[in-house]
């Protein structure tokens, strides 16, 4: 019964978080892929093209990808933790669950990013072939290894100490997002077919960090606090 609860509760929590934070994700994607635009110009550009709906242009693939990704990672992480396999720990369990999930979610992320950029994925697919589905996966793999080894394991560690899901999830998201930001930047640009090298100034690779934090911190806080709330409710029945 517990395994079904892990999947269901994490899926519900992720859908809620994704719907709330999707506009910021669209904003971030456009900002990282338009290096000549300021945040204000980028925001105006999205709105002028499609109005408010432009920020929700990739709703279906975004919700599908994030829901499957988070619920699968959470379920697998819990599964490996409960099995208590030898020679494993929280970080290894997180990495394994993240890599297994990313093989399916990366193609959906590709579709999402093209939609967020107001571009036709099908036209790009005809030009580039089916390899387009996994373009940028090397960056996605690196991002997955880092994020999966940190988010759930770090959250569990912090929550054992603070015993406050809001504080634990907030600190986890800030630390993890800041560390993996350069890979997120490279992944977003690689998927869209843009140049990766932006000079030796590390600041270029942290473009969009504030937007990423604005998206991921509330997303992870909403997800983990909702899971915690639903888990407690489930135990009452």
UniProtKB/Swiss-Prot annotation:
PROSITE patterns: SOLCAR. It is a multi-pass membrane protein. Its main location: host cell. Keywords: Host membrane, Host mitochondrion, Host mitochondrion inner membrane, Membrane, Repeat, Transmembrane, Transmembrane helix, Transport. Pfam families: Mito_carr (PF00153). SUPFAM superfamilies: Mitochondrial carrier. Gene3D superfamilies: Mitochondrial carrier domain. Solcar repeats lie at residues 1-83, 85-161, 164-233. The chain crosses the membrane at residues 11-27, 60-76, 91-108, 140-160, 166-183, 205-226. InterPro entries: Mitochondrial_sb/sol_carrier, Mt_carrier_dom_sf. The keyword Transmembrane helix applies. It is found in: Host mitochondrion inner membrane. GO terms for cellular component: host cell mitochondrial inner membrane; membrane. A motif (Substrate recognition) lies at residues 191-196. The keyword Transmembrane applies. PANTHER family: S-ADENOSYLMETHIONINE MITOCHONDRIAL CARRIER PROTEIN (PTHR45667). Belongs to the mitochondrial carrier (TC 2.A.29) family. Transports dATP and to a lesser extent dTTP, TTP, UTP and ADP, possibly across the mitochondrial inner membrane. This is Mitochondrial carrier-like protein L276. It comes from Acanthamoeba polyphaga mimivirus (APMV).
């Amino acid at each position: 019964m517990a395994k079904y609860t892990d999947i269901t509760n994490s899926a519900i929590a992720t859908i809620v978080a994704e719907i709330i934070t999707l506009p910021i994700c669209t904003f971030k994607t456009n900002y990282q892929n338009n290096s000549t635009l300021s945040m204000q110009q980028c925001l105006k550009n999205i709105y002028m093209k499609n109005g408010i709906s432009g920020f929700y242009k990739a709703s279906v693939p975004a919700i599908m990808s994030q829901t499957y990704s988070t619920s699968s990672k959470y379920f697998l992480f819990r599964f490996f933790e409960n099995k208590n396999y030898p020679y494993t720990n929280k970080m290894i369990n997180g990495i394994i669950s993240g890599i297994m999930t990313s093989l399916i979610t990366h193609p959906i992320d590709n579709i999402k990013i093209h939609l967020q950029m107001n571009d036709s994925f099908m036209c790009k697919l005809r030009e580039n072939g089916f390899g387009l589905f996994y373009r940028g996966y090397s960056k996605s793999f690196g991002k997955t290894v880092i994020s999966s080894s940190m988010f759930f394991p770090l959250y569990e560690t912090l929550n054992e100490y603070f015993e406050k899901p809001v504080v634990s999830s907030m600190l986890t998201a800030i630390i993890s997002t800041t560390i993996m930001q350069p890979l997120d930047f490279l992944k977003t640009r690689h998927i869209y077919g843009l140049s990766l090298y932006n000079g030796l100034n590390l600041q270029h690779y942290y473009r969009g960090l504030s937007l990423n934090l604005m998206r991921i911190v509330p997303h992870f806080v909403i997800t983990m606090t909702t899971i915690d709330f639903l888990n407690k409710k489930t135990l009452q029945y």
